[in-house]
Design a protein with these regions (language model features):
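Active-site rim beta-loop-alpha module in soluble metabolic enzymes
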Residues: 50-98
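Short acidic/polar active-site loop segments enriched in Thr and Asp
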Residues: 10-11, 102, 121
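Metabolite-binding pocket within alpha/beta catalytic cores that recognizes anionic/polar moieties
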Residues: 1-53, 57-61, 117
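Generic non-transmembrane alpha-helical segments
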Residues: 62-70, 114, 154-165
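Generic structural signal for well-ordered, non-membrane alpha-helical segments
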Residues: 52, 56-60, 72, 89, ...
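His/Asp/Glu-rich mid-to-C-terminal helical/loop segments that flank catalytic regions of hydrolases
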Residues: 132-176
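Zn-dependent metallopeptidase/amidohydrolase metal-coordination segment
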Residues: 109-143
Length: 176
């Protein structure tokens, strides 16, 4: 990301998969990340200690409007970023769910912290690959491959729409 930033890129649309924590969340819906719980190491090299790091309101609003307009199922939500996936213990899972996380992944907090530090805009759209349970790991979600292809198409469409927008500085922020 930083290398791309040095070449003048300042808006980052990120997609990826995540383990589902909140089983009430429809697994076929996408997660538009509003904020990430910082439980990894990289973000602390870029920002002062804090529980959360927010993603870009500007890009989130752009993605939100695109997803609504095109009929995709999604929810703005919080993710938990950790770089120690073998330490997703029952106690830590409970704590992160209490703190609002609907899913767990390994990069959002780090990327969002770098973006904030460097003055970039970053948003992340996630799909569920599996369910992280307190006592075991589930198999991969049956829609995983379909959702991965769908999120890749969404990202390509978003970038094209963003680049062809007359003035992306005038993106209207939406309340999520």
């Amino acid at each position: 990301m930083e290398n791309l930033g040095f070449f003048g890129i300042s808006n980052f649309f990120v997609c990826g998969d995540a383990g589902q924590l909140d089983t009430d969340f429809d697994p076929s819906e996408f997660v538009l990340v509003k904020q990430a719980i910082r439980d990894e190491g990289t973000s602390y090299h870029y920002l002062p200690p804090a529980m959360y790091v927010e993603t870009s309101k500007k890009l989130n609003s752009f993605i939100y409007s695109y997803l609504k307009r095109n009929g995709y199922k999604f929810q703005p939500a919080t993710t938990w970023t950790t770089d120690a996936f073998y330490r997703e213990t029952p106690k830590s899972i409970d704590r992160r769910i209490e703190q609002g996380a609907v899913c767990v992944e390994m990069e959002c907090a780090s990327l969002a912290a770098i973006a904030k530090y460097r003055g970039y805009e970053l948003s992340q759209l996630l799909y569920f690959s599996d369910v992280v349970k307190k006592d075991s790991w589930s198999t991969f979600h049956p829609l995983r491959d379909e959702l991965r292809l769908m999120v890749q198409k969404i990202m390509l469409d978003l970038v094209e729409e963003f680049l062809t927008a007359k003035n992306n500085d005038e993106i209207e922020e939406v309340e999520m």
